[in-house]
Design a protein with these regions (language model features):
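Acceptor-substrate binding/catalytic loop of class I
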Residues: 74-91
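Conserved donor nucleotide-binding strand/loop of the catalytic core
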Residues: 179-225
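A short glycine-rich, Lys/Arg-flanked "PGG" loop and its adjoining helix->strand segment in the class I
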Residues: 40-55
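Acidic donor-binding/catalytic loop of UDP-sugar-dependent glycosyltransferases
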Residues: 35, 177, 234-251
Length: 383
């Protein structure tokens, strides 16, 4: 009985494979993507090993079957498996695009357990061919409030990417020693600057204290002080791994997107990284904003984002206008990016539990605020 669903899966798989023929060779990935911790890196590695005319056929479980397959496992009708990636077709399409593939088709039966996606390598775009993906400077804004024990761990965890990096801490209204931790870190990094220069990589740390309140005000100040070609936001709570930041950089440098928005709702989360009610609310409002904006948003509340500084300067007036009703600043950026027709690309990231401190989100208050922002967006973009 434990193999019942596996038998159904393979029967469905055989029926669908009959409809596909490929020339130039193919690579078949049969139900493996559920176990891969970083699918973007996985597909990038595959791309490096195959010929340009090779097609990849990806077979995986339809995400609509997740609750049924989970129940089947509990009832002993399906073999036990570890925590799985449950991707819908848009999730996989987005990851393939980020990895340098072009999606040819995606098929599933109405009641089918199996989804088949066919993709091929994209022709390398001009920016990547000329090696310019490492020629842009980066300013990383890090708003920090009550993050004393996280601050010292941030910079060592940020990979070296880009022409040079400018890391901008903005602290405000902390009740612990966050500001002291930032200034101590800045001093230590300044002593190491000569070593970075010897290795032909420049990393500068700046620190400011905001006079206003809230994350949105902190990011606004950081953007005003930034000088890099690409602007990034990275939350000091470290719930998103800093090792994912190069993915945001590469998405812009390669021309795949113009506004890179993190998404924590693709991969499984760690423990109680996001409470169930918060997750459901995020999913609901993401669907609402997707319909309003006409561009796909899986996670509107992820704090990790990236955009070109030149684009930010063009949309700055709208950004400051929307900032008046958005204490976090995420929607002010999203509204402005959509209004200025920037191409949004989502970057799937892992979401971890906090190691220190507590969230600044007030569930019901900010839920009402999201409803207000959705109403403002509807009036702005639909009426």
């Amino acid at each position: 009985m434990a193999n019942l669903f596996q038998e159904l899966y393979h029967k469905d798989l055989k029926r669908i494979y009959k409809t596909f023929k490929t020339s130039g060779g193919s690579v078949i990935l049969d139900n493996v993507i559920g176990d891969i911790p970083d699918l973007q890196s996985y597909f990038e590695n595959i791309k490096r090993e195959i010929n340009p005319d090779t097609k990849i056929l990806i077979a995986y479980h339809n995400s609509a079957w997740e609750p049924f397959l989970t129940l089947a496992t509990k009832l002993g009708l399906r073999k036990k498996v570890g925590v799985q990636n449950w991707l819908d077709q848009e999730d996989l399409r987005n990851i393939l695009i980020l990895s340098g593939f072009e999606v040819i088709s995606s098929q599933r039966r109405f009641f089918g357990i199996t989804v088949i996606t066919v993709a091929k390598p994209q022709i390398a775009n001009y920016k990547l061919q000329t090696g310019s993906e490492s020629q842009y400077s980066v300013s990383i804004m890090i708003p920090a409030r009550n993050e004393e024990q996280n601050v010292s761990k941030i910079i060592p965890s940020i990979p070296r990417f880009g022409k040079w990096q400018e890391i901008i801490f903005v602290e405000g209204n902390s009740t612990d020693r966050t500001w002291s931790a930032i200034t101590n870190l800045k001093f230590l990094i300044s002593k190491q600057t000569s070593n970075f220069n010897e290795q032909k990589f420049k990393r500068v740390v700046k620190a400011y204290q905001q006079t206003g309140k809230g994350k949105a005000d902190a990011v606004r100040l950081g953007f005003a002080k930034a000088t890099g070609d690409i602007l990034m936001i990275y939350d000091a709570d470290r719930t998103v791994p800093a090792s994912d930041l190069p993915k945001f950089y590469n998405a812009l440098a390669s021309g795949i997107g113009e506004f890179a928005n993190g998404s924590r709702l693709v991969y499984p989360m760690e423990g109680q990284a996001m409470q169930t009610l918060n997750k459901l609310g995020n999913q609901f409002f993401s669907e609402v904003f997707t319909r309003i904006f006409g561009q796909h948003f899986k996670d509107t509340l992820c704090g990790t984002k990236a955009l070109w500084r030149s684009d930010f300067l063009k949309m700055k007036r709208d950004y400051l206008k929307y900032l008046r009703v958005d204490p976090f600043g995420d929607f002010a950026l999203i509204f402005s990016a959509v209004k200025h027709n920037l191409k949004v690309i989502e970057i799937p990231v892992r979401y971890k539990e906090r190691e220190y401190g507590s969230t600044n989100i007030k569930r019901f208050y900010h839920g009402l605020l999201l409803a207000k922002l959705a109403y403002i967006a509807f009036k702005e973009f639909k009426l």
